[in-house]
Amino acid sequence: MTHFDKPTYTVRKTRKKEIPQGVYTKDPVSGEAVFTKDIADNQMVVPASGHHFPIGARERLGYLLDPGSFVESNIEVRSADPLQFVDSAPYPARIKKYEKESGLPEAVVTGAGKIHGVPVSLAVMDFRFCGGTLGSAAGEKITRAIETAIAQKIPCIIFSTSGGARMQEGILSLMQMAKTSAALGRLAAARLPYISVLTHPTTGGVSASYATLGDVILAEPGALIGFAGPRVIKDTTKQTLPPGFQTSEFLLKHGLIDQIVPRTEMRERLHQILLALYVKQTPASASVAKS
């Protein structure tokens, strides 16, 4: 071969190893790829950074309650369309879309169950259904969960995640703030404990009513909690907001919540609180807790 000869190359084709979709999930805190299975096995919390991914209402109930103890109630309560509201789509069409996306008939799941044998009435919100907004059906279900606690003389626990009142129902949605708060007043008069757990995000009319009326208020780490969002406040006040404004850590520092509890510790922490506020204070409940 001379200096002017064109060299020949052999191209060897190799098959690129493809990683199946869904094996890894990016951690928003560290930016690293984490095995999805490791996150799922840790209640959708990244083991290293502690980042809490959103979960559905039924998943949360599965993490919290004794196996087989949950009995769902108020399944028949559904959203109506009293205002015949239409924006880019009719309200009933939106409801059907939310039902399909979330697998739920409404933004909250209610029922009764047990935590280490202690009976409780629960309402657990799900952000996937219309952003967890509070409408007349959701408000009715939450009120009934509180009334169940009163009737059965058991504690009430509400997990909140919401964008606020549901605009498609107008004043009927706003009325649920007063309705649920009044029911909690009756629960307090019956001297029964109410534990409120705030998860990301809890805003608007929900944060301004039952979410912040608990005898004990817990929150998951890093949750956004407030009435108006930080962008709206910044645009309105024309001021720079402090770091971490409206996070659960900020609220704990300023005395607006009682504890921050990681999801993986929530079941045990709730049990401790129930023992202090209910079992030890109510002699008749001790035998129920052991059953």
UniProtKB/Swiss-Prot annotation:
Cited Pfam families: Carboxyl_trans
GO BP: fatty acid biosynthetic process; malonyl-CoA biosynthetic process
CC terms in the record's Gene Ontology section: acetyl-CoA carboxylase complex
Cellular location(s): Cytoplasm
All residue ranges annotated as the CoA carboxyltransferase N-terminal domain in the record: 23-291
Keyword Cell inner membrane part of the UniProt annotation: no
PROSITE patterns linked: COA_CT_NTER (PS50980)
Lineage: superkingdom: Bacteria
Key words of the record: ATP-binding, Cytoplasm, Fatty acid biosynthesis, Fatty acid metabolism, Lipid biosynthesis, Lipid metabolism, Nucleotide-binding, Transferase
Main location, first listed in the record: cytoplasm
EC code(s) of this entry: 2.1.3.15
Cross-referenced InterPro entries: AcCoA_carboxyl_beta, Acetyl_CoA_COase_Trfase_b_su, ClpP/crotonase-like_dom_sf, COA_CT_N
Catalytic activity: N(6)-carboxybiotinyl-L-lysyl-[protein] + acetyl-CoA = N(6)-biotinyl-L-lysyl-[protein] + malonyl-CoA
Keyword hit for ATP-binding: yes
Pathway: Lipid metabolism; malonyl-CoA biosynthesis; malonyl-CoA from acetyl-CoA: step 1/1
Single GO molecular function: acetyl-CoA carboxylase activity
Family of the protein in this entry: Belongs to the AccD/PCCB family.
HAMAP family, per database record: AcetylCoA_CT_beta
Subunit text: Acetyl-CoA carboxylase is a heterohexamer composed of biotin carboxyl carrier protein (AccB), biotin carboxylase (AccC) and two subunits each of ACCase subunit alpha (AccA) and ACCase subunit beta (AccD).
Annotated function: Component of the acetyl coenzyme A carboxylase (ACC) complex. Biotin carboxylase (BC) catalyzes the carboxylation of biotin on its carrier protein (BCCP) and then the CO(2) group is transferred by the transcarboxylase to acetyl-CoA to form malonyl-CoA.
Entry protein name: Acetyl-coenzyme A carboxylase carboxyl transferase subunit beta
Organism field: Opitutus terrae (strain DSM 11246 / JCM 15787 / PB90-1)
Gene symbol of the encoding locus: accD
